[in-house]
């Protein structure tokens, strides 16, 4: 009973966290990061204003945009829901899994990470979207979904002991998976850094075309693509290592990871050469964050 209870709470927390990453990405691509210029309130209110007349006199009314304000407010509210979900999960872990270090510590680390990232969200606003703080915010989110995914799969193993009792990965596979996870995190951060630099260059050079903005990045722009193809080759190597795997699910996941990396590279190259909708960038980043969690499984 306790195994299933923790598994459900961990799974819900993981799904909600991925949804939060999506909404956070929507905040980024829509320019809603300062949709609520103060924190934790929004224009001095616990619920965002619906008209300019509701804005306090000490806040510049020209900064108000009802759509951006409610997108940012939705992001914050979802963050609160994720926080409470992880608190419930942690309480279950403390009550029933004090002798299971994998479950207990995954829950405690999740609680720490969601709390730290919530506090960092306030700093993101007060720093006026400082690129370094925004990147750190993303790193903690990736660590959070990784730890949650780990706790979820460990609790699933407890429910299905017969299926997983004789399964162990070789050292070569384990090292390759850890390397793949680390490289994907670095790849996401590189992509975020490139986008941030492009936005900063565009502010100083508003007449630059997309090609000129990319040229201004110099050799930095190639790192993202080179690392992307490195990930592709590493995933091919993992497919080779899993060729004789007796557990079909593991083999299918590795093939799925390979397919997602291939698609992400294709989508990334399209974004370089064509003017695709901003939502394309959102799904590009979100898809990469899913890879981080799937590798843990």
Region locations from a protein language model:
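Membrane-interfacial catalytic/cofactor-binding modules of polytopic membrane enzymes
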Residues: 187-231, 236-240
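Interfacial helix-loop-helix junctions of multi-pass membrane proteins
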Residues: 26-36, 115-138, 195-206, 265-289
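Individual transmembrane alpha-helix segments
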Residues: 56-84, 219-225
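N-terminal signal-anchor transmembrane alpha helix
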Residues: 6-40, 182-193
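Extracytosolic (periplasmic/ER-lumenal) interhelical loops and adjacent juxtamembrane/interface segments
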Residues: 29-72, 200-213
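Hydrophobic cores of alpha-helical transmembrane segments in multi-pass inner/ER membrane proteins
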Residues: 82-88, 141-159, 229-237, 288-297
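Small-polar-interrupted transmembrane alpha-helices in polytopic inner-membrane proteins
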Residues: 12, 16-23, 105-124, 179-187, ...
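Membrane-interface helix-loop-helix junctions at transmembrane boundaries of multi-pass membrane enzymes
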Residues: 92-108, 171, 239-257
């Amino acid at each position: 009973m306790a195994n299933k209870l923790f598994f459900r709470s961990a799974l819900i927390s993981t799904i909600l966290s991925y949804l939060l990453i999506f909404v956070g990405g929507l905040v980024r691509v829509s320019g809603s990061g300062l949709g609520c210029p103060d924190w934790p309130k929004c224009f001095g209110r616990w619920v965002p204003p619906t008209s300019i007349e509701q804005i306090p006199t000490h806040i510049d009314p020209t900064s108000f945009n009802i759509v951006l304000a409610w997108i940012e407010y939705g992001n914050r509210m979802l963050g609160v829901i994720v926080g409470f979900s992880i608190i419930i999960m942690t309480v279950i872990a403390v009550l029933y899994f004090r002798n299971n270090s994998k479950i207990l510590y995954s829950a405690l680390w999740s609680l720490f990470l969601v709390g730290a990232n919530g506090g960092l969200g306030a700093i993101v606003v007060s720093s006026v979207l400082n690129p370094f703080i925004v990147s750190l915010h993303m790193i903690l989110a990736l660590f959070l979904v990784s730890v949650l995914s780990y706790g979820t799969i460990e609790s699933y193993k407890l429910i299905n002991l017969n299926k997983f009792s004789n399964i162990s990965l070789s050292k070569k596979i384990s090292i390759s998976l850890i390397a793949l996870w680390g490289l994907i995190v670095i790849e996401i951060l590189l992509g975020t850094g490139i986008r941030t630099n492009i936005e900063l260059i565009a502010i100083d050079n508003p007449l630059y075309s997309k090609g000129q903005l990319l040229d201004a990045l110099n050799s930095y722009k190639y790192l993202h693509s080179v690392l992307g193809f490195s990930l592709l080759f590493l995933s091919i190597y993992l497919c080779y290592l899993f060729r004789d795997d007796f557990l079909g699910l593991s083999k299918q996941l590795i093939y799925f990871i390979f397919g997602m990396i291939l698609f992400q590279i294709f989508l990334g190259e399209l974004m370089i050469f064509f003017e695709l909708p901003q939502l394309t960038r959102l799904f590009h980043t979100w898809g990469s964050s899913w890879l981080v969690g799937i590798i843990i499984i």
